[in-house]
Every structure is written in C-alpha cells, then in structure tokens.
Amino acid sequence: MNSLVRRKQVDSVHLIKNDGPHQLAKKLSAVDLVAIGVGTTIGAGVYILVGTVAREHTGPALAVSFFIAGVAAALSACCYAELASRCPSAGSAYHYAYICLGEGIAWLVGWALVLDYTIGGSAIARGITPNLASFFGGLDNLPVFLARQTIPGVGIVVDPCAALLIMIVTILLCFGIKESSTVQAIVTSVNVCTLVFIIVVGGYLACKTGWVGYDLPSGYFPFGLNGILAGSAVVFFSYIGFDTVTSTAEEVKNPQRDLPLGIGIALLICCILYMLLSVVIVGLVPYYSLNPDTPISSAFGDSGMQWAAYILTTGAITALCASLLGSLLAQPRIFMAMARDGLLPAFFSEISPRTQVPVKSTIAIGVLAAALAFFMDVAQLSEMVSVGTLMAFTAVAVCVLVLRYVPPDGVPLSSSSQTLSDTDESRAETENFLVDAIESSDSPLLGNETARDEKYFGKRRKIAAWSIALVCIGVLGLASAASAERLPSFPRFTICGVSAVILLGSLITLGYIDEDEERHNFGHKGGFLCPFVPYLPVLCILINTYLIINIGAGTWIRVLIWLLIGSMIYIFYGRSHSLLNNAVYVPTMTCTRKTTDHLA
C-alpha cells in the first residue's frame, strides 16, 4: 500500500540538466499556447450542439448556458493555471497528482487521460471523413483509397481516411514542437474565421428579419432555470481541451507567465465565440425550428444562403483537425512523463536529439490511434473521453487544496532517483541529507518552543488533511444523492443532508485554519495563484463530480474495465519499476538547500 501513496519531488524534472539535445526544446510562447488551447477546445461539436441544446433545454437563452458552463470551466482552469506555473511538466494532471496525491492516483489519472487523447483522437478522425465527403457529394463518391469499406463476414467498417489523417498528423508532430504549433495556429485561425463569419453574416441576416427567434410567446426562458442548468451541463464538454496546454509546459519559454496566460486567454476566446454564436443562431430562427443535426447550415439555408454550407463544412473540418492535432500532441508527452518515473517502459521517454520531441512515443501513440480509427467504430467509446478529462479536472482541484494546506514535507532520495546520479559522491550526499535532517530536528538550540511549534503545525496538517478527505466524501455523497432520481425521497434527502453537513463543516474548517507555510517552498515562485481557496477548488470538485456521476451506466462499465486494465499494468510493471522504490524521504527544506548546493 505504501507504493500507492508515495509522492515524488516537485522539481524532479527540473533537477535534470535541461540544456542538452535530449531534452524538450523550449520554443513556445503565449501566442502558441493560445492557438493550441483554442484549437483543441473548439471542436466540430459546437456546429451541432447549439441546435440540440436550444431545442431540448434552453430555447433562446442558450448563451446563458454557455456562460454558466464557461464559468464552471474557468474554475478548473484556475486550478490548472496555479499548478502548471508552479510545477511545469509535460505530465500535466498526472504530474500534479503524483507530487500531491501519490503514485496510485497519479497512475489512474494518467491512464484515464489516454481515454481523452488517444481514443478521443480516433473518434475525431472518424468524424472528419463524412465532413470531407461532403465536398465529393457524399461518402459513396470518395476516392476508393479513402472510402469506408465493410469487411465481408465480420461486418467491420474500416475507415482508411481517418487512419491516414492520423498518420499525417503524427508525422507532422515528429518534425518539432514549433512546426506543430505553427500548423495548429493556421488551422485554428481558419476555424475561428469561420465562426466569425457565422456570427457577422448571421447577425446581419437576423437584423434584416428582426431577430424573430427572440420574439416568441414562450419568452426568453421557455424551459426555466432547470433547463438552463441542464443545458450548461451539456455544453460544459465543449470547453474541454484547454488542459492540453499544460502538457507542453516543458516546451514553454516562460512557463510561470505564459502557461496561465495561454489557459486563460484560450478559455476566454472560446467562451466569447460560443456565446456570440448562440445569440445569432437562436435569433436567426425560432429555437424549435432548428435542425438538430445541422442547425447552422439549416438556419443559413432557410435564409437563402445555401452556398454558406461549404464554408461551414470547411470550418468543421479545420475544427476537427485542430482537435486531432491537440490530442496527439498531448498524449506522447504524458506517456513520456510516466516513463521517466519508471511507471512505463523507458522507450516512451526517449527524445530525439534532432527534433527534441518524443518521436518514439509520438509514433507509438499515432499507430495505436490510427488502428483504432481504422478498425473500430469509436462512437460507442466517445462518451468515455469525457470521464478521463473530468477525473483529471477533479484531481487537479484536490491537488490545489493539498498544495495549500498539506504540501509534501518530505523529498524522496535514492540511488535510482532522477535527482542524483548513482555515484559514491551521490550516496555520500544522501547520507549527509539524512544526518542534517536528524540534526536539524534534535538540535538543543531549537528548544522547547520549536518542539511546540512542530506539534502545532503537525496537528494543523492532520486537521487539514482530514478536512480535505471529508470534503471529497461530502461532495461524492451529495452529488450521488442529488443524481439518484429513482431513490425514494426519504433516504435520498437524508443522504443529501448528511453529505451537505459534512461538506460544509469541512469547508468551514479549511476556511478557518491557516494555509501551510511550506506552500511557499513548493515548486517555482512568481506564477499564478488560484483565488478564493478553498472555496473555488471545492466548487470545482463538486461540479466535476456531479458531471461524472451523471454519465451513463454503460459508459461507466467500460471506464471501469479500462481502469482495471490500467491497474493490472501498474501492479505487474509500474509498481516494481517505479523510481521511488526504496526511496528515503528527508525534510523538504534540507533537501532544497543541499540540492541547490549540489547543482551549483
């Protein structure tokens, strides 16, 4: 069990000499990060989502749902921004969980992100084929080498176009991060220009017709507050993608400044575009007249602009290509981070000295994603994508609480660790670390006052740790009971009440006690700080947990099977190959001082 809770050093990545050709190249600026964030977030789903949500949940108030969902996504973005600037690593949420929550949860988070990036990338590639076919007059008119074919006898529909697109993107990613980000910026610009075209031209047409979509007897809120909130839960998933930015952290020139900027600006741009698009589309035609499959194309067609369908299709294709590029960009870097920690084979951690990207990992992920897109109809697996991302969002919010109230107070040192090489000198310094740690705690010069302070801080850390654990328990109980509509009223409201008391009591406790002073020594300084702690992270945990619980039972069964497979890999490989095996933990301040001297 100790292996599940062992935590690695926050700066283990940065203590490696990072100026050689075998490290990731620092070439990205804030502008590059914004392009990656916007491109990965704005998928083609928004071209369909507006019609479905407006018809079934919100009516003309669709923009309000997008705003609420944007605020909810911003909560997670704030948590990501703090951790990304404090401990920039290609591992993203996996890395944050490893240094705050332990190896076991970190592995599950990293394994769950495979759902988001690899399976999600395959689903995206499959979605490009029908959009591309519209330029050829339909799927049946595609060239033979691109057309979908059914394998006789087994009924499997293969999609060579999707597989080919994935391999093209994989080759592009192998050329280097700057080349990939440049292409991402170009493709994203085309997509954004398409959305601006829809907003401007659609707004002009709506002005000519008098914004008929808002002049309805049912008013602006035909489905009431419940409809607005239900719509927000659906459109929240259109904001997923900004977290891809954090997987490029080791390739950013100034991560403390640019990572928070990239995350925040990307999310703001997406929110503004979504809201303006919603205002125009539901104003152009009555919400009940929107085509649920092609709402924007149909709205323009009803206004006599059938030719606009080609522009919209171009936008959908570029949106999918940008999302695909972002997915295949992030996954190899997360696997690279896991391999550097010993949890995956070292093959995934190798970096090309010429292009300074994890070429082998990128090719492996590309081949896997291409095979999935070629052979499998991943539509049934697409819902699993959201689970992986929401699990990461939740873990990151918990990490912020841990960082502020119970940051790691020990640093792992061993002959196999990443921080020191296996030499006689290194072993001698490790012994000195232990001696210094013991002497610093037993020195008579510290006196009884220091002992009392240590006792107080130790008690405060225990209270904070239990409060964070009870917050998670309260959130889980409250979200579960609130979602259990088939549960009888009495037990349902009882569980809600008890869970709410646990949640509020723990939250009040966290708000009352002081944050740990060691948080100032955690990671890099001068970056973004998440505001309104502990309230903002707890609200983030509550929202994400509610969304996770409300995902269908069939999807959850598939997710649990996937996590079980990952657990087996960890038990039989990762646990025994972890670099933290037989690690010795010493006080953070002692190690920080000695490590600094060693590096100097």
Curated annotation (Swiss-Prot):
Function, in words: Permease involved in the transport of the cationic amino acids.
Family the entry assigns: Belongs to the amino acid-polyamine-organocation (APC) superfamily. Cationic amino acid transporter (CAT) (TC 2.A.3.3) family.
Alphabetized UniProt keyword annotations: Amino-acid transport, Membrane, Transmembrane, Transmembrane helix, Transport, Vacuole
Subcellular location: Vacuole membrane
Main location: membrane
Protein name: Cationic amino acid transporter 4, vacuolar
GO molecular function annotation: transmembrane transporter activity
Transmembrane segments: 33-53, 61-81, 93-115, 153-173, 185-205, 221-241, 265-285, 309-329, 361-381, 383-403, 463-483, 493-513, 529-549, 551-571
GO biological process: amino acid transport
Record gene name: CAT4
Recorded topology in the membrane: Multi-pass membrane protein
Organs and tissues of expression: Expressed in roots, stems, flowers, and leaves.
Pfam family, one: AA_permease_2
Keyword Membrane: yes
Gene3D superfamilies, sorted: Amino acid/polyamine transporter I
Domain of life per record: Eukaryota
Spans within the Cytoplasmic topological domain: 1-32, 82-92, 174-184, 242-264, 330-360, 404-462, 514-528, 572-600
InterPro entries in the record: AA/rel_permease1 (IPR002293), CAT_C (IPR029485)
GO CC annotation: plant-type vacuole; plant-type vacuole membrane
Gene source species: Arabidopsis thaliana
Vacuolar topological domain: 54-60, 116-152, 206-220, 286-308, 382, 484-492, 550
